[in-house]
């Protein structure tokens, strides 16, 4: 009876210690994700072009998604199992473990809802810039003054076109 209680106490201590280790790493990952996403949302995005590190992050996410889709086409399992199912070297050094952890963290960041929302906003900004260049090309072909004035919504209309019969006091 005492031996059984001792085993139960050891098992609970082991469980609590493993949960605390897991929660620390999960908290670190969540803090990293939160820091990265707040930096994305806090910095202002210029209408001309986004900062280079944000585009690099978008490119990295698309690269990771392309790798995952290529692995799925090759017949591998779900997205969660992609890192685990790849052939790993027999001897894992610190660099390979850190690289695998980094890839896994990048996958989680790319799949997070906040980043996907930011990516959609970024694509809309880039598409909006392309639409403006298309409109400017149309203006260059047809140069009428009225069309050019109607195209730019952000400029206020000047009140120099007035009726001759109106009086101002």
UniProtKB/Swiss-Prot annotation:
The keyword Zinc does not apply. The keyword Secreted applies. GO terms for biological process: blood vessel diameter maintenance; cellular response to dexamethasone stimulus; cellular response to lithium ion; cellular response to nerve growth factor stimulus; digestive tract development; hyperosmotic response; liver development; negative regulation of gene expression. One of its GO terms (cellular component) is transport vesicle. Its main location: secreted. Transmembrane segments: none annotated. GO terms for molecular function: neuropeptide hormone activity; neuropeptide receptor binding; receptor ligand activity. The record marks 159-161 as: Cleavage. Keywords: Cleavage on pair of basic residues, Cytoplasmic vesicle, Secreted, Signal, Vasoactive. It comes from the Eukaryota. InterPro entries: NeurotensiN. It is found in: Secreted; Cytoplasmic vesicle, Secretory vesicle. Residues 1-22 form the signal peptide. Neurotensin may play an endocrine or paracrine role in the regulation of fat metabolism. It causes contraction of smooth muscle. Belongs to the neurotensin family. Interacts with NTSR1. Interacts with SORT1. Interacts with SORL1. This is Neurotensin/neuromedin N.
């Amino acid at each position: 009876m005492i031996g059984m209680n001792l085993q139960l106490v050891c098992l609970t201590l082991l469980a609590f210690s493993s949960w605390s280790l897991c929660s620390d790493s999960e908290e670190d990952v969540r803090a990293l994700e939160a820091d990265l996403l707040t930096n994305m949302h806090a910095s202002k995005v210029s209408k001309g072009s986004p900062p280079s590190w944000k585009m690099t992050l978008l490119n990295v996410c698309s690269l990771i998604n392309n790798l995952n889709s290529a692995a799925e086409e090759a017949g591998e399992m779900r997205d969660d199992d992609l890192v685990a199912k790849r052939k790993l070297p027999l001897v894992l050094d610190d660099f390979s473990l850190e690289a695998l952890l980094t890839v896994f963290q990048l996958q989680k960041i790319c799949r997070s809802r906040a980043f996907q929302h930011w990516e959609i906003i970024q694509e809309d900004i880039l598409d909006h810039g392309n639409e403006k260049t298309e409109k400017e090309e149309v203006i260059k072909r047809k140069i009428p003054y009225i069309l050019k004035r109607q195209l730019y919504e952000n400029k206020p209309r000047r009140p120099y076109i007035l009726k001759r019969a109106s009086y101002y006091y």
